[in-house]
């Protein structure tokens, strides 16, 4: 597939998400156009990168459907200069989109070595390797060296909200995380940390993510 064809197909996907009200803000629309999904999929799946469905990536994992990533980014309300932590790097696409929105460094944690390598290659290709820092480790523990965070985005389903992630949020910060069953059914939680350290949870409907594995998540 020619790059021009991939760009046209991707443009139509982004415009469809806008028409459907999934992409609501111009800044998320522009980020999607600047960071196309086809740069983050396996070569054999590039021709399907514009389709609004998850696709397989190494390590038995998936790259999320475009509509799901858009929903999470709109909920996150990312602003320039925010300190963002991304859990479950996967392909690196979510972290690159976040970096494009905040215009500064983003930290992302991945437990599968094969995916760390895959994400780093994709980020290099897309031009975000200097701003997106991929750390290998247990994402359920967050990444304390760069805490506290304005936003934490989690691209895997947890049995409950991991306490270390809440602890690493700034007062007024937000955690976007799927919570629920191991077997691909969760609710999307928007967890807001209040100034007194307590949290308020808003639920945003059913989603389907791979499980969040780790000390404060599911066990392997």
Curated annotation (Swiss-Prot):
Pfam families: PCMT. Gene3D superfamilies: Vaccinia Virus protein VP39. It comes from the Archaea. The active site is at 64. Keywords: Cytoplasm, Methyltransferase, S-adenosyl-L-methionine, Transferase. It catalyses: [protein]-L-isoaspartate + S-adenosyl-L-methionine = [protein]-L-isoaspartate alpha-methyl ester + S-adenosyl-L-homocysteine. The keyword Transmembrane helix does not apply. Its EC number is 2.1.1.77. Its main location: cytoplasm. It is found in: Cytoplasm. GO terms for cellular component: cytoplasm. One of its GO terms (molecular function) is protein-L-isoaspartate (D-aspartate) O-methyltransferase activity. The keyword Secreted does not apply. GO terms for biological process: methylation; protein modification process; protein repair. Belongs to the methyltransferase superfamily. L-isoaspartyl/D-aspartyl protein methyltransferase family. Catalyzes the methyl esterification of L-isoaspartyl residues in peptides and proteins that result from spontaneous decomposition of normal L-aspartyl and L-asparaginyl residues. It plays a role in the repair and/or degradation of damaged proteins. PANTHER family: PROTEIN-L-ISOASPARTATE O-METHYLTRANSFERASE (PTHR11579), PROTEIN-L-ISOASPARTATE(D-ASPARTATE) O-METHYLTRANSFERASE (PTHR11579:SF0). This is Protein-L-isoaspartate O-methyltransferase. It comes from Thermococcus onnurineus (strain NA1). The lineage of its organism: Archaea, Methanobacteriati, Methanobacteriota, Thermococci, Thermococcales.
């Amino acid at each position: 597939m020619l790059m021009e064809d991939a760009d046209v197909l991707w443009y139509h996907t982004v415009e469809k998400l806008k028409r459907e009200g999934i992409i609501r803000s111009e800044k998320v629309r522009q980020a999607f156009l600047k960071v196309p999904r086809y740069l983050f999929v396996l070569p054999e799946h590039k021709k399907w990168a514009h389709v609004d469905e998850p696709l397989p990536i190494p390590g038995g994992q998936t790259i999320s459907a475009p509509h799901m990533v858009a929903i999470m980014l709109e909920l996150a309300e990312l602003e320039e200069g925010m300190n963002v932590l991304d859990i479950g790097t996967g392909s690196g696409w979510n972290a690159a989109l976040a970096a494009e929105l905040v215009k500064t460094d983003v930290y992302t944690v991945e437990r599968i070595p094969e995916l760390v390598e895959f994400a780093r290659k994709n980020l290099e290709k897309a031009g975000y390797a200097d701003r997106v820092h991929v750390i290998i480790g247990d994402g359920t523990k967050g990444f304390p060296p760069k805490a506290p965070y304005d936003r934490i985005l989690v691209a895997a389903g947890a049995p409950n909200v991991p306490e270390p992630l809440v602890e690493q949020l700034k007062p007024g910060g937000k955690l976007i995380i799927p919570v629920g069953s191991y077997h691909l059914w969760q609710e999307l939680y928007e967890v807001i940390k209040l100034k007194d350290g307590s949290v308020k949870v808003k639920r945003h409907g059913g989603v389907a993510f791979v499980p969040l594995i780790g000390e404060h998540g599911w066990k392997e």
